[in-house]
């Protein structure tokens, strides 16, 4: 593993996961939880930018970056969906939980698909593209707004966060279909 600034930022994002979860669960400051999650989102942008700008792209970074995103997003979505204080305040607790399940299910499905395509020597078919990057950005934005809204329990921000999450869920499904469509020729041969 090359120890580049970009890879260090990605590792920092992974290290932030248990910190964000712990702060949330011990009932620490909601603003601290939201701020730490926002920091993780900034490292997601910064690691990619720096890797390209400094010509420090690596196989390790290409592997770990999306894994770090999926772990952070999934961990916090589980916290939010399992928190009665959150689910009692959203417009539709059932839809909220379904969208969380869709997002996490897609992340697992596409991770497995990438692994399988790599086994077949076709990893490029499911490489992270612009749609996946927009999806991840929207997920981070939605969750950040939800965390800040929950910290202050401000209804307009909570509604905005929920609507952003639904948009992220739709984009998540769209990106999954795009990846599956790209991999379908290889899948149908097996």
Language-model region placement:
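A feature for the membrane-embedded catalytic helix bundles of lipid/isoprenoid biosynthetic enzymes
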Residues: 2-10, 14-16, 21-22, 27, ...
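Short hydrophobic/aromatic, small-residue-rich stretches within specific transmembrane helices
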Residues: 33-41
């Amino acid at each position: 593993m090359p120890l580049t600034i970009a890879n260090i930022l990605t590792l920092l994002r992974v290290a932030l996961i248990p910190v964000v979860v712990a702060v949330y669960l011990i009932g620490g400051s909601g603003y601290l939880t939201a701020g730490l999650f926002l920091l993780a989102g900034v490292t997601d942008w910064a690691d990619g930018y720096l890797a390209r700008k400094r010509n420090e792209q690596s196989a390790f970074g290409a592997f770990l970056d999306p894994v770090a995103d999926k772990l952070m997003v999934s961990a916090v979505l589980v916290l939010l969906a399992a928190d009665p204080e959150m689910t009692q305040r959203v417009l539709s607790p059932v839809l909220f939980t379904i969208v969380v399940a869709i997002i996490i299910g897609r992340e697992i499905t596409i991770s497995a698909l990438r692994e399988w395509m790599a086994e077949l020597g076709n990893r490029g078919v499911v490489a992270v593209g612009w749609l996946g990057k927009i999806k991840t950005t929207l997920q981070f934005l939605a969750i950040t707004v939800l965390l800040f809204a929950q910290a202050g329990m401000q209804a307009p921000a909570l509604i905005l966060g929920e609507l952003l999450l639904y948009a992220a869920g739709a984009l998540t499904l769209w990106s999954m279909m795009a990846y599956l469509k790209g991999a379908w020729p290889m899948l149908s041969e097996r």
